Amino acid sequence: MTTMAETQTWQTVLGEEKQEPYFQEILDFVKKERKAGKIIYPPQKDIFNALKLTPYEAIKVVILGQDPYHGPNQAHGLAFSVRPGVPAPPSLQNIFKELHADLGVSIPSHGFLEKWAKQGVLLLNAALTVEAGKPQSHANIGWHRFTDKVIESLNDHPEGIVFLLWGSYAQKKSQLITNLRHRILKAPHPSPLSAARGFLGCRHFSKANQLLHEMGRGEIDWALDEKVS
């Protein structure tokens, strides 16, 4: 017997949204900006990596970011993650510090979080593109409408999901998460500006696994392998 989750995919829950005129306008805007010679991150092929790597039916945990990294070779479509060989930015360093303090896992030499994504951790930014060197430059081109729809579709997910909301921006999205089967954990943002105010010490990784266990869902192996392809 197939469950409701197994019959739903990103295509079934977002297919109609992608037909909306505003969605095509976003893609056209990004295309036009690239054509005009502007550097846009992440590369075109990586924009929807979060949805490609973490199937709707497999989602267990959601970590929300604001927008992609705006430096060279960093962003590749997963919130907080950077490509192999690129130094971990400060927020990600603090995530690793907390992971080490919480679960005792060693701090990796890279910041490539694909292993999390493939286990059911959706690493979703609210805006999916950004202009080089200009944080939040694409915050108002329509992405938020689309990613709010993503969150609303997760609220309807038939399995319990743990949402990790770090910082006031992510926490505002909790109003979209109304289904009582889900669990929400909140903490300050891991940025150096706020990490010491309660992100460090939040123990969200062990708490998420405990909640998944209570919901009868498999836990996440948060430890990252030293070798990445």
Curated annotation (Swiss-Prot):
Active site, renumbered: D67
Family matches, as SUPFAM superfamilies: Uracil-DNA glycosylase-like
Ranges in coiled-coil conformation: none
Enzyme Commission (EC) number: 3.2.2.27
UniProt cross-references to Pfam families, sorted A to Z: UDG
Cellular compartments annotated: Cytoplasm
Chief location bin: cytoplasm
Family designation: Belongs to the uracil-DNA glycosylase (UDG) superfamily. UNG family.
Described purpose of this protein according to its UniProt entry: Excises uracil residues from the DNA which can arise as a result of misincorporation of dUMP residues by DNA polymerase or due to deamination of cytosine.
HAMAP family, A to Z: UDG
NCBIfam families: PRK05254.1-1, PRK05254.1-2, PRK05254.1-4, PRK05254.1-5, ung
Protein name per Swiss-Prot or TrEMBL: Uracil-DNA glycosylase
UniProt organism field: Coxiella burnetii (strain RSA 493 / Nine Mile phase I)
Primary gene name: ung
